[in-house]
Regions:
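Basic/polar N-terminal segments that are highly enriched at the extreme N-terminus
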Residues: 1-5
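Acetyl-CoA-dependent GNAT
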Residues: 6, 10-94, 106-108, 112, ...
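Glycine-rich phosphate-binding loop
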Residues: 96, 100
Length: 117
């Protein structure tokens, strides 16, 4: 039996603006706001499209109907083995931190990576 109220689900286009807000809010908390940081990646504004390709998946975490975080997987760019993937753009607003959502999202991403092979 789960002891939390959040829900992990695949991202939809409806979630794109919310995830862009979350990413642009969280990254500066850690000093990650200049050139070369993911905060400036064009895909931040359309995560549902960016992670809709082969061997890609992105999930959002909802709490009481509000998206408070997300994270996903995609093939590792430049890898010689196309089966190698990486965790990408995993961010949570403070209201979701410290409750185990990160662990559950990581497990969800790892399960999807295994499914991809």
């Amino acid at each position: 039996m789960k002891d939390h109220n959040w829900k992990i689900r695949p991202i939809t286009p409806y979630d794109d603006s919310r995830m862009a807000y979350i990413i642009r809010t969280v990254m500066p908390e850690y000093g990650a706001k200049g050139d070369g940081f993911a905060i400036n990646d064009p895909e931040v504004d359309w995560m549902s499209k960016a992670y809709n390709g082969p061997r890609c998946a992105y999930y959002v975490v909802e709490l009481e109907g509000q998206v408070l975080g997300g994270g996903g997987i995609a093939p590792l760019e430049g890898a010689t083995n196309p089966r190698i993937c990486e965790l990408r753009k995993m961010y949570f607003l403070p209201a979701l931190r410290g409750q185990g959502a990160g662990l559950e999202l990581m497990q969800t991403c790892l399960a999807k990576a295994r499914e991809f092979g």
